[in-house]
A protein has these predicted regions:
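Inter-motif core of Ras-like GTPase G domains
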Residues: 15-27, 39-60
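P-loop/Walker-type NTP enzyme "switch/lid" segment
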Residues: 1-26, 113-123
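Short glycine/serine/threonine-rich phosphate/pyrophosphate-binding segments
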Residues: 32-40, 63-65
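Helical hairpin unit composed of two closely spaced alpha helices linked by a short loop
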Residues: 48-85
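C-terminal lobe/tail of nucleotide-utilizing enzymes
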Residues: 70-137
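Glycine-rich phosphate-binding loops of nucleotide-dependent enzymes
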Residues: 13, 32, 45, 82, ...
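Alpha-helical transmembrane segments of multi-pass membrane transport proteins
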Residues: 11, 24, 38, 67-70
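Short amphipathic alpha-helical segments
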Residues: 41-44, 66-68, 94
């Protein structure tokens, strides 16, 4: 595994976004860990984002992270459509939700199938997940 930080990470994100031949996109999903680091700053400065949907797990630490992310997104004046609660790896169905300042768009519940999900071979399932997200937008 390669650990990139600061300018190296920002440069890689910039190169990916500028050198990729994008077709007309309706949606672009950017999967990132929670936070407010260099990747977020680069994406908000370099990409012309029209909206953001955040994803979080229903626990106190994740809610603390997403609140910081919400503040950062607001500083860049990018509209937040809402958030999705990702509970697919948590078998505790009674995990309480904390109230956030943005709309809750939906929730993915625990799935035994997701524990063994193989993105390379289960691409149809990955498409279904994306379609579920888009249906709530």
């Amino acid at each position: 595994a390669v650990a990139w930080r600061g300018p190296m990470l920002s440069s890689a994100v910039r190169q990916l976004s500028n050198s990729t031949k994008w077709s007309n996109l309706d949606f672009l999903f950017i999967d990132m860990p929670p936070g407010t680091g260099d990747t977020y700053l680069t994406i908000f400065k370099e990409l012309n984002l029209s909206n953001v949907i955040l994803v979080t797990t229903p626990n106190k630490l994740s809610y603390a992270d997403i609140k910081k992310t919400i503040n950062l997104v607001n500083k860049f004046n990018v509209p937040i459509m809402g958030y999705i609660e990702n509970n697919i790896f948590n078998q505790d169905k009674d995990t309480p939700s904390e109230k956030l300042s943005i709309n809750k768009l939906g929730k993915f519940n625990f799935s035994e199938k997701m524990l063994n999900f193989d993105l390379d071979n289960d691409i149809e399932d990955a498409n279904l997940i994306s379609k579920k997200i888009i249906a709530h937008v």
